[in-house]
Amino acid sequence: MKAIVQRVASARVDIAGQTVGAIGAGLLVLLCAERGDADAMADRMLAKLLKLRIFSDEAGKMNRSVQDIGGGLLVVSQFTLAADVSGGNRPSFTQAAAPDEGRRLYDYFVHRARAAHPLVATGEFGADMQVHLVNDGPVTIPLQMA
């Protein structure tokens, strides 16, 4: 399971011109399930995200988590994180989980996130989405659970 985590001042996801998910300060999480991923990987990814200390404390050091600041999580499915371009210029997505399994793992992750954190918004799995964000920093962290 892979994720790109961006610290944001705000973020939202629109589908067909309608906002379907939005947060203020917090984390935008672009999430990708890969072949062979399991629920335990999603659990570890969520635990890492909730405790990741990438928000500034009073001294300006990255020492606070999204939980510490009461921030939001905006979780967006992003199968293209599984792209492989080693064989040419056109990406291959064969490492991405099959659509049914990808959806199941995404839904599992979102369900667990909502149980663990009070502010969780989402995009829509498999939809054509427009993601709008105000990157804070910018701070962008790639995560991978194996």
UniProtKB/Swiss-Prot annotation:
Matching CDD domains: Dtyr_deacylase
Reaction(s) this enzyme catalyzes, per UniProt: glycyl-tRNA(Ala) + H2O = tRNA(Ala) + glycine + H(+); a D-aminoacyl-tRNA + H2O = a tRNA + a D-alpha-amino acid + H(+)
Principal location class: cytoplasm
GO cellular component: cytoplasm
Span(s) of short sequence motif Gly-cisPro motif, important for rejection of L-amino acids: 137-138
Any one GO MF annotation of this record: Ser(Gly)-tRNA(Ala) hydrolase activity
Keywords noted in UniProt: Cytoplasm, Hydrolase, RNA-binding, tRNA-binding
One GO biological process term: D-amino acid catabolic process
EC annotation from Swiss-Prot or TrEMBL: 3.1.1.96
Localization, UniProt: Cytoplasm
Organism superkingdom: Bacteria
PANTHER family recorded: D-AMINOACYL-TRNA DEACYLASE 1, D-TYROSYL-TRNA TYR DEACYLASE
Subunit structure: Homodimer.
Similarity remark: Belongs to the DTD family.
Entry note about domains: A Gly-cisPro motif from one monomer fits into the active site of the other monomer to allow specific chiral rejection of L-amino acids.
Described purpose of this protein according to its UniProt entry: An aminoacyl-tRNA editing enzyme that deacylates mischarged D-aminoacyl-tRNAs. Also deacylates mischarged glycyl-tRNA(Ala), protecting cells against glycine mischarging by AlaRS. Acts via tRNA-based rather than protein-based catalysis; rejects L-amino acids rather than detecting D-amino acids in the active site. By recycling D-aminoacyl-tRNA to D-amino acids and free tRNA molecules, this enzyme counteracts the toxicity associated with the formation of D-aminoacyl-tRNA entities in vivo and helps enforce protein L-homochirality.
Protein name: D-aminoacyl-tRNA deacylase
Organism: Variovorax paradoxus (strain S110)
Originating gene: dtd
